Every structure is written in C-alpha cells, then in structure tokens.
C-alpha cells in the first residue's frame, strides 16, 4: 500500500452493536475489560468482552455516539455477541441493537495531506481521539499514517464520500485488517472466540484493560493473570 495515496476502505465485515438507555453506562461497566467512563464524545476506547472463565468472546472498539455507545466488532461474531449481551440486561434500562438502521461507517487513510478531505474543523490527531464535524463522528486509529473511521447517518456519509472521496483509491477490508495488524490491534473472529485471555493478545499493552475498575464478567481470571502471572 502506497503511503502517499488517499484510500477509502470497505468495512462491511465489521458490525456495530448499539447499547443505549438510562443504565447503559453501568451495564457496560459490568461487562467489558476497560473503564467505560473513558469513552467520551472526544475519546474512544478498546475493550474485551469475556466469558466467566476470562476467555475473550469479543474485542470492541467503543465510541460514545450521541446518547448511546457503539461497539464495533467483527461481523462474524456480532449476532452472537448481541444475544449474549442481551442476556445480561435483565431489569436494566438498556437496549442492545445490532447494526442500527440508518447508521453508516467507512474507513479512510490519508496519505496525501495536500489532497486531504475538506472539513469544518481539524481531523483528530492522536490515536483513539474523536472529532465531531460535518455531521459525522471521526475517530483517529493507530498507525503512523492518519487512518480514520467515519460514522454517521447514511445520507451524511454518502454525501461526504461523494464530495471528498471520489478520487480516493478503494481498498478491501483485508487491507484495513493489515493496518490493524501493523499497529498491534487484534481482532476476535468466530473461529477464535474463547481461545484467548485478554493478555494473550496484548489487550493490556494497548490499554484495553483497566485493572482498577470494578468487577466484570471474567475479571477474576484476568486480574489473577496480571498480578500472579498465570491463569488458574
């Protein structure tokens, strides 16, 4: 991939799980490995979702989006994960929805700043930073070359692509995944569910585990591995 090019990526192999409601914050805090409080309108987070034995069911990129949280994960596990999360809702005032209607997302790599996309304000400059402009939510991802995730209403995304990205080179999801690998960002697919504890795929190194937060599903195993160096 030439770093001097601007590239747009097809991300159809990703899915979005939307979590919203009065108790959404508390609910997610009891399910994921990271502190959901860090996810704000200007900062996104990575997090794992474990089974009671501390094995990863999913790896999320979580974005605070309006009054909800968007959990981005592999499409191969999204339906199953939506069902599992819904099982934990019980009496909480929370709604869990897979691929909410009307929301669109796409990726871009800005290799040529001279032909950069036109926005009302500046692009996010540090990894995981979020900017909200031109009716879109824009997240900066890890990597030396600016790599961005765009989320918004479908019509806004399509208009933005037509206006700004018509000259971008189109690349597949495999190319997007390669950028994640180069940046040390893992993925969990259907074939790798329940195969790893979070530390085995470096979630601690990339800041996707908070060892000071309260309990969550699988937390005992994750903490024991951290403090004692091995799972039991």
Task: For the regions a language model picked out, list residue spans one by one.
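Basic, glycine/lysine-rich polyanion-binding surfaces/domains
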Residues: 1-232
């Amino acid at each position: 991939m030439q770093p001097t090019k601007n590239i747009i990526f097809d991300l159809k192999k990703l899915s979005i799980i939307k979590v919203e409601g009065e108790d959404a914050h508390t609910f997610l805090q009891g399910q994921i490995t990271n502190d959901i409080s860090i996810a704000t309108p200007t900062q996104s987070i990575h997090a794992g979702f474990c089974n009671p034995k501390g094995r990863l069911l999913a790896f999320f990129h979580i974005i605070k989006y309006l009054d909800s949280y968007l959990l981005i994960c592999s499409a191969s596990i999204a339906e199953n994960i939506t069902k599992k999360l819904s099982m934990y809702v019980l009496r909480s005032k929370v709604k869990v929805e897979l691929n909410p209607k009307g929301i669109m997302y796409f990726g871009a790599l800005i290799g040529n700043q001279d032909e950069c996309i036109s926005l009302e304000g500046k692009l996010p400059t540090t990894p995981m930073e979020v900017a909200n402009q031109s009716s879109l939510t824009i997240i900066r991802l890890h990597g030396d070359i600016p790599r961005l995730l765009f989320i918004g209403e479908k019509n806004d995304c399509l208009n933005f692509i037509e206006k700004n990205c018509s000259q971008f080179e189109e690349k597949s999801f495999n190319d997007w995944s390669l950028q994640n690998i180069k940046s040390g960002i893992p993925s969990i697919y259907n074939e790798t569910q329940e195969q790893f504890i979070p530390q085995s795929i470096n979630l601690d190194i990339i800041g996707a585990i908070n060892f000071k937060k309260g309990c969550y599903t699988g937390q005992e195993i994750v903490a024991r591995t951290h403090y004692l160096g091995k799972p039991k």
